[in-house]
Amino acid sequence: MGFLWRTRSNEKKITPVLSWPESEPESEITIPPEFQCPISIDLMKDPVIISTGITYDRVSIETWINSGNKTCPVTNTVLTTFDQIPNHTIRKMIQGWCVEKGSPLIQRIPTPRVPLMPCEVYEISRKLSSATRRGDYEKCGVIIEKIKKLGDESEKNRKCVNENSVGWVLCDCFDKFSGDEKLTFMLNEILSLLTWMFPIGLEGISKLASATSFRCVAGLLKSTDDSVRQNAAFIMKEILSLDETRVHSFAVENGVAEALVKLIRDSVSSSSTKSSLIAIYQMVLQKPEIASEFLEIGLVSITVEMIVDAENSVCEKALAVLDAICETEHGREEVRKNALVMPLLVKKIAKVSELATRSSMSMILKLWKTGNTVAVEDAVRLGAFQKVLLVLQVGYGEETKEKATELLKMMNTQMKLMSDCVDSLKEFKYIKKPF
């Protein structure tokens, strides 16, 4: 049956409205004002006291504070501290009242979990660090499982864990045991935790970028388990963000290119596709010679097909990858061969995002500067001139506008050449042309 909830100013009356008329209506249930949260005017499930002495439901007051408010909603007094103390007395009274009413409309509120405190996180971190130094992987596994459970309980717990440097300790633990194939499950659990702990700092990423750690992440990237591959792709993206030659050499040695392209081709998830594209972009940007490896496994055609109907965040990353590929001669040749490229580049200008617009214009410029005037003619015929003019009129950054200006000059020159060519054909306008 369905119910409608009617709210009055100082108290809340719950009046069930039955979904079929033949049933007898139940009696009204009035929530006592002292059990209502002053913010939501709803029954408090986790009552807490703030510095002004007023009791609120924890979720409501946290939302209020996280929105930037620094005063008590009731008294309008500036809060001296944002600490929230559980009001056990009110909670027990509410629980007793729920049981006393014994109505299906009112369920007994469960005893809320005590929020995670920084001192607890510090102790967890200390124990994990100690077990890692001793090489006690069993103890590490127990602590890792505890961190996982805490993170699953609430977003607030995750925030507390992130703010107390657990990420670095987990990276150290991963590096310590990354060479042991028997501990693959535990190592993947660490990567799974790290996906919600970034940024973890340069020191932590450096631990993951060691030779043994990198080899382990690359191995997990080739797993048959999609969730494992997704975690590994996210971590690989972060490792490759390091501007270090050795890291990109590790990528070549461990067959990372093929694993990333396979992950994109398999369409495991939007997040894994984005992580893979960012990782590929970083690899090609830092080590252009690796582009040939990506070209051999069909990256251009896969990326172009993706751009056709991908969501904006994926589309802009795919365009950035193609732009990086066009830095090499072999890459430009492969891009020219694909008939879809130029129509897509023109279409995405001023449509997806500034990054996508800049990447599209950059690719057209690269193709023209290397002697491909046909590409520019195609761009002009497809309406690129008008779209690039639009780029100069909207609020894009200086770098984007500079590319737009350069591209306009180039297209203007090409349009004049095309116009002269058309004029020279006027003398043949009376010659009958076969269909």
Curated annotation (Swiss-Prot):
UniProt-listed Gene3D superfamilies = Leucine-rich Repeat Variant, Zinc/RING finger domain, C3HC4 (zinc finger)
Instruction: Please report the stretch or stretches of sequence annotated as the U-box domain.
Output: 30-104
Its recorded reaction(s) are: S-ubiquitinyl-[E2 ubiquitin-conjugating enzyme]-L-cysteine + [acceptor protein]-L-lysine = [E2 ubiquitin-conjugating enzyme]-L-cysteine + N(6)-ubiquitinyl-[acceptor protein]-L-lysine
Q: Name one GO molecular function term.
A: ubiquitin protein ligase activity
Q: Where are the ARM repeats?
A: 202-241, 245-285, 288-327, 329-369
CDD domains xrefs: RING-Ubox_PUB
Position of the signal peptide: none
Q: Name one Pfam family in it.
A: U-box
What are the EC numbers?
Answer: 2.3.2.27
Keyword Oxidoreductase attached? no
GO BP annotations listed: protein ubiquitination
Keywords of this entry: Repeat, Transferase, Ubl conjugation pathway
Which PANTHER family does the entry mention?
U-BOX DOMAIN-CONTAINING PROTEIN 21, WDSAM1 PROTEIN
Summary of the function given for this chain in its UniProt record: Functions as an E3 ubiquitin ligase.
Q: What is this protein called?
A: U-box domain-containing protein 21
